[in-house]
Amino acid sequence: SRLFRELEMPLSYVLYSMEKEGILVKPEELHLYGEALNGRIAELETSIHEQAGGEFNINSPKQLGEVLFEKMQIPGGKKTKTGYSTAADVLDKLAPQYPIIKDIQEYRGLTKLKSTYADGLAAYIGEDSRIHTNFNQTITATGRLSSTEPNLQNIPMRMELGRRIRKVFVPDENCIFMDADYSQIELRVLAHMSGDEQLIEAYKMDEDIHRITASKVFHTPFEEVTDLQRRNAKAVNFGIVYGISSFGLSQDLSISTKEAKGYIDEYFKTYPGIKTFLDKLVSDAKEKGYCESMFGRRRPVPELK
């Protein structure tokens, strides 16, 4: 097929050369990074114990749940068979009101950074001071690449200390790193494949697509769209691409399910071609047992049959 001949086979040679070349790292920078993580982790540990009024194993969900929801009497605890849940979604809702929760979230993030990157990457540095990851071409269901041993496609960006790991990776002499990123590629592909005239016209205007959507969905003049309306429209724009439900959107925006459903319904009124396109995608997949990309890549979805 065209996908195999023109895309997959030529790409295999590119990936081989990338794996062979590897990426240059500075072991001393990685060591300093680990030291910085250790220092901040120790500070957080002390702070958490002081706020809790005593020492306990922060890494134990059982102990952590008992401290937060019994000893400290923080409301909102969810009891499970093994004790109180301290999952990320539970802590996310409590973090704005309780400083100890924010510290616990940061502690968890930094301990993961330490084990995965500060300690984990060191084991993969070769004699050439490079890390040679494996790029997996045919493992993911969607056709995207994945990276293993180690995973270099998931270098953290959200936390300040997470971003510092990037200093460990350096370009070769007389070279630089470059970053190229498509602008709103998912929405542009959706506009192309759905043929929705309103969305295509919005892109032709070369204005802020999320502000345009907010203006249309919330029936507000473009110049008067608030930052909150734009943020909500952005969540709907990208959520629709990935089949978000009214419940999922309500969780993302901290609004009621009814209000979220209203946003989605209004979105489909604004861009009717998208609704038609998405419905056809589902009906075709039910009939064929797979969906297909613009390039002919098929993804089986037997659960729809």
Regions found by a protein language model. Give the residues of each.
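Conserved ATP-utilizing enzyme core subdomain
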Residues: L281-P300
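Gly/Ser/Thr-rich helix-start
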Residues: R144, T220, I240, I244, ...
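Function-dense linear segments that define catalytic or interfacial modules
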Residues: Q137-F222
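Amphipathic, charged-and-aliphatic alpha-helical interface segments
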Residues: V225-G243
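Generic long, charged, amphipathic alpha-helical segments
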Residues: M205-Q229, M294-K305
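Short, contiguous acidic/charged loop-to-helix segments that flank catalytic cores in large enzymes
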Residues: A122-G126, L199-E201, E224
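Conserved "right-hand" nucleotidyltransferase catalytic core of DNA-directed polymerases
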Residues: S1-E160, I176, S183-E186, Q229, ...
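Short acidic-hydrophobic surface loop/beta-edge motif
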Residues: Y124, T138, V168-V170, Y290-M294
